Design a protein with these regions (language model features):
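Amphipathic alpha-helices of TPR/Sel1-like and other helical repeat/solenoid scaffolds
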Residues: 44-52
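Short coil/turn linking the two alpha-helices of tandem helical-hairpin repeats
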Residues: 74-75
Length: 218
């Protein structure tokens, strides 16, 4: 499976539980809590989810599994792509999403919040991640705002992920500013002076003055 970001056209799907791709995804996801700790095939989950998106449409449960797989395989970049997909679905397609029950949607997003938070806390953020952090923060803000507007008995704690991205952005901004300040304040390094070793000058030898001829006195 290529790690190149996939362009997904959001077309909402119906109940995917009768689809073999969805059942295969669930089998892999169930390995997470298996006592034997078998290896989860995240690449397979990603591939099967994309197949479902193309042939059956996008549902909330599969989109969450897809985002988790992308995060596992591609770190912050995968997480950001998944958050943008989820934000687009929840904000633009809330009335048409599967599952239809608001409580089921809350449970799915709460499960996602817990699982992906554990993955992100293992990520070593650097200043190069700042652009992706901004994108993820924006998507999570849209997602959070929408969840505050709809009627839910229990609102999933997406703000935990939002705060994580906001705090990470502040830390990376501070590190970037400090690095720039240090670079600006660094003293100008001059190349070392070059000293030429010149042999001591020999004493100037002058010709002995010839005796002046004696004056002839007559």
């Amino acid at each position: 499976m290529s790690d190149t970001p996939q362009h997904i056209i959001i077309k909402t799907g119906t109940d995917p539980r009768n689809r073999p791709e969805f059942n295969a995804i669930r089998e892999e996801i169930n390995k997470i809590n298996h006592p034997a700790r078998p290896e989860v095939n995240w690449g397979l989950i990603e591939s099967l989810a994309l197949t479902l998106f193309r042939t059956h449409g996008v549902d909330l449960q599969t989109a969450v599994y897809y985002t988790l797989a992308r995060t596992q395989k591609n770190g912050l970049a995968g997480f950001t792509e998944g958050c943008e997909l989820l934000a687009g679905m929840v904000v633009g397609q809330w009335d048409h999403l599967w599952p239809e029950q608001p409580q089921a949607r809350s449970e799915i997003l709460e499960w996602f919040n817990t699982r992906v938070s554990n993955q992100l806390r293992q990520h070593d953020f650097t200043r190069d991640d700042l652009r992706l952090v901004y994108r993820a923060e924006r998507a999570l803000q849209l997602l959070y705002d929408k969840l505050q507007q709809v009627e839910l008995k229990r609102v999933p704690r997406i703000e935990n992920l939002l705060y994580l991205m906001q705090n990470t952005a502040k830390k990376l901004e501070s590190a970037s500013d400090a690095a720039k300040a240090q670079q600006t304040a660094a003293p100008l390094k001059m190349p070392p002076m070059v000293y030429l070793s010149v042999p001591e000058a020999e004493p100037v030898r002058t010709a002995a003055a010839a005796p002046e001829p004696a004056a002839n006195i007559e």
